[in-house]
């Protein structure tokens, strides 16, 4: 009987901790001879209860600080939360755990001595301690306000649980950028085609945007946008403005009767005049103008007006056509040619006695091939014997000899004998 009863109580004590009260009541009804065994069982119950509570506290340790204060009464919560608020801020950072435990042990009030075993075990579990997310962090901060009562904390806790976390911003290499780049490239190509079709230059677009929308852009900026040479950020800023201008420019000529605001000038006022398109004249009209040009190449203003009325053309177009046709006629009839040098003739050599004779001119040595000889007669001027030589008898040496012969008639025969005669004459012998 004595041996079976302790076995029965041990089986009941190894179960759930909640059965400890039943074990105590049954143990009180045991005989007086088993008092010593009852004391041992009571100690075993207390140790098992303490072990279970320690396991529960260790398993729920990350949420211990944020959930523990909510179970306190409303009067005691304000003071306890004020002291736990710096504790929460310090425990959230894993790098300061060893210093935090010593600091908290020195400043913990008497009512919170139960937290000391948990704080002492923090340095051994640094690897398992994680930073809380946005929701629990906001919850603990809302609980830590000293001025709030227990009833007023509930809406703050509910609101903090529904707060959205930080949105993920796509990086520069995300999936959205290629789509935007394709759209920008397509818009730039379409914008250029529609701008040329409307007859506006890049400078006109920049000037119009400055007057219409207050953002003045240069011709270079519009050109770089069409060539996709701007940065992605600048092109994204410029696209809506250009798109708005393009829509206004296309809707303006199609609906001229539409009323525009007084603060917005019309496109004709902005641009002054569009780029004039190339004039195309039909074949029959061109033949008529050619016939009129053959009759009168330079008509007057009245005649130009009459021709323009007959052909249903603008007067300025007819005037410009006649001006261009005259310039074309000058290019056809007066080609540019190199000027021809006039021939150089030798002076006549006349003897003082009046007798007509021919004087032989010594040959002139030159670097050009061929020699030129000329004969002087009263009725014939000296000309080059060969047409391809291009060298006349008016070289400096020949002219000097001719001048000497004309000035000194007595020495004409001497000079006409040539250099060979002078060097072989007895007077030159030394």
Curated annotation (Swiss-Prot):
Record field: compositional bias (Polar residues): 23-32, 67-78, 392-413
Tissue specificity annotation: Expressed in epidermis and hair follicles.
Start-end of Low complexity biased regions: 129-139, 251-267, 355-364, 374-390
UniProt key word Ribonucleoprotein: no
Record GO terms (molecular function): DNA binding; DNA-binding transcription activator activity, RNA polymerase II-specific; DNA-binding transcription factor activity, RNA polymerase II-specific; identical protein binding; RNA polymerase II cis-regulatory region sequence-specific DNA binding; sequence-specific DNA binding; sequence-specific double-stranded DNA binding
PROSITE patterns with a match to the protein in the record: HOMEOBOX_1 (PS00027), HOMEOBOX_2 (PS50071), POU_1 (PS00035), POU_2 (PS00465), POU_3 (PS51179)
Protein's UniProt keywords contain Flavoprotein: no
Single GO BP term: negative regulation by host of viral transcription
Annotation: DNA-binding region: 274-333
Subcellular localization: Nucleus
Family membership: Belongs to the POU transcription factor family. Class-2 subfamily.
Species of the source: Rattus norvegicus
Gene: Pou2f3
Region (Disordered): 1-40, 60-81, 129-180, 248-267, 355-413
Name of the protein: POU domain, class 2, transcription factor 3
GO CC entries: cytosol; nuclear body; nucleolus; nucleus; plasma membrane; transcription regulator complex
